[in-house]
C-alpha cells in the first residue's frame, strides 16, 4: 500500500503534467463552406454585406484546407473563379509569436487571371517570401508561406475569405461562416508543427 508521501508525489506529478501540457494543435484542417452563402451590399454602403446572393457563383467558397509544417499552405476551392469583376482574396494570420495579425492578399483586376500578392507582418513590413496562386481551371486559390518567413511560430491560425466587386456591388464569402462579419474573417483552429 502506498504511503502518504508517494500518493502526494503522484498527485503533484499529475497536477504538474495537467497544468503544463500544451493544448493539442492539429497540423492540418479541412472544411466545407455552404455553396450559395455569398452576401452582398452596394459598394457605397457602409454596412456589413447582408443581402443573400444564392445564385452568385463567382467567389463562392465551397471547400478549404490548410496545413502547417515547413510552410503554411491554404487551398480554397470555389464554385466559380471566372475572371469577372475585381477579386480580392484575403487571409489574416495569428501566430504563437505575434501579438498582432499578419495580413495577406491577392488582388486580381477585372478580366485577369493573375494578381498582385501582398504579405504584411505585424510590424507593418511588406515581405516577399510568400505567394498565392490563382488556378481558374481548378477553381482554387492556394496560399503558400514558408514557416521561416513567419518566423517559425509553434502554431498558426488562419482566417480567410473572398470579395468580388462587380456591377456596383461587393460580394463577400467567409470560408468558415454562412454569413459575413463586420470586420475580418472567422479564424480556424491552431495549426501546429
Label every PLM stretch briefly.
Residues 149-168:
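Short, surface-exposed ligand- or partner-binding patches at beta-edge/loop junctions that are enriched
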Residues 60-64, 129-134:
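Beta-strand-rich interaction surfaces with strong enrichment in secreted/lumenal proteins
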Amino acid at each position: 500500500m502506498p504511503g502518504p508521501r508517494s500518493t502526494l508525489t503522484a498527485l503533484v506529478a499529475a497536477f504538474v503534467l495537467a497544468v503544463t501540457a500544451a493544448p493539442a494543435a492539429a497540423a492540418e484542417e479541412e472544411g466545407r463552406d455552404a455553396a450559395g452563402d455569398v452576401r452582398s451590399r452596394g459598394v457605397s454602403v457602409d454596412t456589413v454585406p447582408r443581402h443573400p446572393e444564392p445564385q452568385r457563383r463567382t467567389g463562392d467558397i465551397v471547400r478549404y484546407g490548410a496545413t502547417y509544417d515547413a510552410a503554411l499552405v491554404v487551398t480554397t476551392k470555389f464554385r466559380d473563379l471566372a475572371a469577372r469583376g475585381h477579386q480580392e482574396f484575403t487571409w489574416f494570420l495569428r501566430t504563437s509569436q505575434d501579438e498582432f495579425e499578419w495580413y495577406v492578399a491577392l488582388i486580381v483586376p477585372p478580366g485577369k487571371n493573375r494578381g498582385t500578392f501582398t504579405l504584411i507582418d505585424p510590424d507593418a513590413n511588406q515581405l516577399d517570401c510568400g505567394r498565392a496562386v490563382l488556378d481558374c481551371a481548378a477553381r482554387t486559390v492556394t496560399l503558400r508561406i514558408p514557416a521561416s518567413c513567419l518566423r517559425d511560430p509553434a502554431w498558426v491560425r488562419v482566417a480567410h475569405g473572398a470579395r468580388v466587386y462587380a456591377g456596383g456591388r461587393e460580394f463577400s464569402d467567409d470560408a468558415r461562416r454562412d454569413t459575413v462579419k463586420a470586420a475580418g474573417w472567422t479564424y480556424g483552429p491552431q495549426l501546429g508543427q
